[in-house]
Each structure stands twice: as structure tokens, then as C-alpha cells.
């Protein structure tokens, strides 16, 4: 099992993730995504969007605002009920979520004793004001979830897209939670991104579609992101774990170095949200569906799939990370990412920094950069350049050498098994495209 400290070291060293405000001492629970991190994050997001919107004719996209009227959060139950229970250790002053510690045992931080304060609720929403006057009428919140932006746009999307039940609305966006304890690197943070889809169905079809989306979402991680199946599991919520809006729920969990944790939730939200907004807005018809064939009018039930994008980045790094002992006794760190997720698809090297080789390498870069994200490197030994690309997950390295000048061929080196092939420059585009399309995950990953 990979160690968390190895993932954090790689992420910071190679430019996947940086501590926010680091030059000022850092800000707990907040992270910046570097040049490689943003590429990996965008690639995961792109695959999710494709799997949701492009592969389902009855699912469309939305990008709702972060700021919304506070009445929305009153209706959804977040103002009154979106809180965690917290306790403080009286000896070391550390703060914990009450459900994360055994109050009958010693403090996990100072180990002195179980001298905890009584549990008290802590609302997780960030409150601010909009406009020039700071009073109760101008109170506004940073959204703690993206779902409510979908629900209040139910009628807008339904009418403008000419959709019929069942249909879904997908959204990727930032959410904010004032976590009592932000921990485990980018797993639990105050600012994060969600990939959510709300699927609206007839109440009598809720069980059928609930089962469908459980399987569909598990398949996404296994078949699309190529996450190892033995590190994934589907876990049902018991009645005490259900959110205030959920009738039933399942989590897809991944086995991180710190144990199995949720990466996506599939929830049967019933008609809770649409009914609440119907009541609080005094506009019931907006949240009602009229079936023109059966003449039936009803408030749809909702199945939610809610995945953490930033958690998915951490999962992908953990799942792809490997260390190998080579025959010469050296150690090789490899990120065995699927090529479609890799920040760079190709690295191009002139064997040595000679004008005639650099010119050809630059020409290849220009010819391919419109179709592939490419890293160009002409410094250091070829072996060190290979190792640098292995560490960041680049699947293919193209080397221009003196034979290239004679026969217009280059060496293509594959990341996982380090095999090399001579390929004509004119065939590079089709070769790389075919390799990515037919990529098989490494069984030794």
C-alpha cells in the first residue's frame, strides 16, 4: 500500500498541489493546484462530463452561481440543519468532530486523558454579506453544495431543453464548507469541487433508477478512470447516517492509505428538495411535472450522484503511484495513469542538444501540439529525462537521435514497461492515437 507521505511529497515536488498562501505560512485546509494538478483535474472532469452528458441523451449541463438567495438555504434545511457536532480537548485545546473520536478514550492528539468538552453543533456554511450594508437582509452564503442550484433551475431547464421525465441535470462546480477538521491532504478541505447530477424520475420508478445509477457510477471508476476494483466498495448508509434530505443512500468508497473513504455518494432524495422549494417560494407549479400523455401531475423524485472532483484527484494519484526496483539496483517512481488522464500525453527529447536534432524535435512538437499536450525537454541525460516523465505519468516519450536525420524515424518509449519502438515521424500521430485508444491498464500497477 502506498504511503500518504509519498503522495504528498510527489504532489508538491512535481507541481500537482501546493499549500495555499504558503509564503505567508499557509492556510489550513486550502490548497492550490499547480501546472500538473490542474491538468489532471481537468482530465478527470472531462471524462466525467462525457460519461454523464455526452453519453446520455436525457442529461444536460448547468453552471449555476455560487451565490444564491439565503431563502434557498433555509428551504433546503442547510441553515437550520447543516452542522457537525464538535468537541474540544480541555488539555491540548485540539478540536475534533464528535463522530471522529471515542469520547471514552484518551485524546488522539495529546494522549493525556478523555477530558473533552460537551458536544456542540457547528454550522458548516460560510456566511458573508452582499451589497454595501451589512445587516440581516444582506446575509448570503458560499454554497455548501452545488445541488440546490440545479433544483431551483428545474423549470428553466425542463422548458428550455424540451426534456421529459426521466431526465438529469449535471454540474461541476466549487462548494465551500467550514470543516471543523480539514485533514488528509486534499481529501477533506474547506474549498472543493463537486461533480453532481440530479436525475428526475417518476416516483414509481425510483427504485429501478436508483439501482441503475449505483452500477453506472461504479463502472465509471473501474472502466473509465481505470481504478483498481479491489480498492473500491459500495457501502449502504444506515438510518443514523442518512442526510436530512435522503430516503436512502450508498457511498462508493476507495481504500486510501488512511482507510476506506467516500469518493461519491448516490442518494435517493425523494421529492424533498422540490417540495421544500415549492413551499418556500409559494410557487408549486414551477416544481411540478405535467405528463402530457397520461395527464398526470406530480413532483418528481430525485436520484443524486455526487462525486468529489478533488477527492478523485487524490484517489487517482494514490491508485497510480508505484515504486520499482530496477535490475541495476536503482529505484523508479512511476505514475501509471491512463493516458487520457495523464497531464502530458507525450514528452519530446532531442538525444543531445545539437542544432540538427533540436530542429527536428521542435518540428515534431509543432506538428503534434494541437492534438496532444506535450512536454519538451532537452536538458540532462536521456535516462534522467525518462525518469522525470515516469514520475508525472507521461505515457510516451519520443526521442530524436542521429538515426532520425537519416531515416525520419524516432524512438517511442512506453512508460509502464519501458519498451522502445522505432516509428516514422509521419506515423507518430496515428500511432499515439491508437496506443491511447487501445491502452490496457498494467496488471502490475
Curated annotation (Swiss-Prot):
Its EC number is 6.1.1.14. It is found in: Cytoplasm. One of its GO terms (molecular function) is glycine-tRNA ligase activity. Keywords: Aminoacyl-tRNA synthetase, ATP-binding, Cytoplasm, Ligase, Nucleotide-binding, Protein biosynthesis. Pfam families: HGTP_anticodon, tRNA-synt_2b. ATP binds at residues 177-179, 187-192, 262-263, 308-311. Gene3D superfamilies: Anticodon-binding domain (3.40.50.800), Bira Bifunctional Protein, Domain 2 (3.30.930.10). GO terms for cellular component: cytoplasm. GO terms for biological process: glycyl-tRNA aminoacylation. It catalyses: tRNA(Gly) + glycine + ATP = glycyl-tRNA(Gly) + AMP + diphosphate. CDD domains: GlyRS-like_core, GlyRS_anticodon. InterPro entries: aa-tRNA-synt_IIb, aa-tRNA-synth_II, aa-tRNA-synth_II/BPL/LPL, Anticodon-bd, Anticodon-bd_dom_sf, Gly-tRNA_synthase/POLG2, Gly_tRNA_ligase_bac, GlyRS-like_core. It comes from the Bacteria. Its main location: cytoplasm. Substrate binds at residues 97, 145, 192-196, 304-308. Belongs to the class-II aminoacyl-tRNA synthetase family. PANTHER family: DNA POLYMERASE SUBUNIT GAMMA-2, MITOCHONDRIAL, GLYCYL-TRNA SYNTHETASE/DNA POLYMERASE SUBUNIT GAMMA-2. Homodimer. Catalyzes the attachment of glycine to tRNA(Gly). This is Glycine--tRNA ligase. It comes from Borreliella afzelii (strain PKo).
